[in-house]
Amino acid sequence: MNARTQAIFDARARIIKALAHPTRLFIMDELSRGERCVCELAKMVDADVSTVSKHLTVLRSAGIVSDDKRGLQVFYKLRCPCVLGFLDCVQGVLKANAREHLELAK
């Protein structure tokens, strides 16, 4: 693998790694419905604002979400909604795995 190809796969891995946490997946699901402020998301996940802010920082650093500061509040939205297609694909894999396990259990 040459350096350019390695850099591309490293960048992809960073994005996938940013998604690899249940709380961040939940946040993504909520943001698919529209922008939310950190305080709303904190209530939804039953966590401190600081904890949710750290998760959002990971997602922002990966380029998945963008933020907009309005007064004392920070609102987040999906920067690239196409990432939801990837999450749909993950759900498809889960369904396929469940069917396979059911077949093996017969």
Placement of each model-derived feature along the sequence:
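Conserved phosphate-binding and hydrolysis motifs of nucleotide-dependent enzymes
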Residues: R24, H55, G63, G71
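Alpha-helical residues within the helix-turn-helix
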Residues: K43, K54, R60-S61
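N-terminal helix-turn-helix DNA-binding core of bacterial DNA-binding proteins
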Residues: N2, A7-T51, Q73-V83
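Beta-hairpin "wing" of winged helix-turn-helix
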Residues: R60-R70, K77
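Conserved segment of winged-helix/HTH DNA-binding domains
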Residues: A11, F75-K106
